[in-house]
Curated annotation (Swiss-Prot):
Pathway given in the UniProt record: Amino-acid biosynthesis; L-histidine biosynthesis; L-histidine from 5-phospho-alpha-D-ribose 1-diphosphate: step 4/9
Assigned protein family: Belongs to the HisA/HisF family.
Keyword Ribosomal protein (UniProt): no
Protein name: 1-(5-phosphoribosyl)-5-[(5-phosphoribosylamino)methylideneamino] imidazole-4-carboxamide isomerase
PANTHER family xrefs: 1-(5-PHOSPHORIBOSYL)-5-[(5-PHOSPHORIBOSYLAMINO)METHYLIDENEAMINO] IMIDAZOLE-4-CARBOXAMIDE ISOMERASE (PTHR43090:SF2)
Enzyme Commission number: 5.3.1.16
Location(s) in or outside the cell: Cytoplasm
Organism: Bacteroides fragilis (strain ATCC 25285 / DSM 2151 / CCUG 4856 / JCM 11019 / LMG 10263 / NCTC 9343 / Onslow / VPI 2553 / EN-2)
Keyword flag Amino-acid biosynthesis: yes
């Protein structure tokens, strides 16, 4: 069964969503992310994707207190991303309750450091973030496009020990227009043992069913849940 991973994106300690990574499109859904996390947990959700959007823009972890509150008041398994640029950032994330961390920009800008994290903490704790725009990896809170192409990027890091990848098609994220099924099928055809976590575009329970049928191991979703297009009750079929 596909693993369900709701997302809580944080700006100024509040639960927000963006469209295509545009900070100007910010919409606040709840002033208290802990309330959101507790509601997820009460409905059978076991894992959470927490993104520090302030951190992603500032190049260092910012909303670690919110991470600590969520982790201390729920039993959710949390993977945390946004602003992880140094050993200190990683320690802050783990000390404040993250069980896993996701590195995207760092894997492009400082691959030596990212590989040290893989070696030190193991592939169970370090997730590769592959945020894609026109098949190239985007960095710095999606504001910049790198020269890294997706498939060589994935091949390189799977050879270095990465086993889990969150792949977000930026053109889909927050648009409620459906996920990039063909892209995910292509990735799994090339990397059949990869724990691929699809992210971006989920608009309905049918999208989750389609990802499940395509063999995608896990899915991150947010706006569809916050906008009421998917209900927590509907998700019970996958739990």
């Amino acid at each position: 069964m596909i693993e369900l991973i709701p997302a809580i994106d944080i700006i100024d300690g509040k639960c927000v969503r963006l469209s295509q990574g545009d900070y100007g499109s910010k919409k606040v859904y709840n002033e208290n992310p802990v309330e959101v996390a507790k509601e997820f947990e009460a409905n059978g959700i076991r894992r959470l994707h927490v993104v520090d959007l302030d951190g992603a823009a500032s190049h260092h972890v910012v909303n670690y207190r919110t991470l600590d509150l969520i982790s201390s008041r729920t039993s959710l398994i949390i993977d945390f991303g946004g602003g992880l640029k140094s050993d200190e950032d990683l320690i802050i994330a783990f000390e404040n309750g993250a069980q896993m961390v996701t590195g995207g920009s760092i894997a492009v800008r400082n691959p030596d450091l990212f590989c040290r994290w893989i070696d030190r903490y193991g592939s169970g704790k370090i997730i590769l973030g592959a945020d894609v725009k026109d098949r190239r990896i985007a960095v710095n809170g999606w504001k910049d496009e790198s020269t890294c192409e997706l498939f060589p990027f994935l091949k390189d890091y799977t050879q270095k020990g990465i086993e889990k990848v969150i792949c977000t098609d930026i053109s889909c994220d927050g648009m409620l227009a459906g996920p990039s099924l063909d892209l995910y099928k292509e990735i799994l055809a090339e990397h059949p043992t990869l724990y691929l976590i699809a992210s971006g575009g989920v608009s309905s329970i049918a999208d989750i069913e389609a990802l499940h049928e395509a063999g995608v191991p896990a899915v991150i979703f947010g706006k569809a849940l916050y906008e009421g297009r998917i209900t927590l009750k509907e998700l019970q079929a996958f739990l």
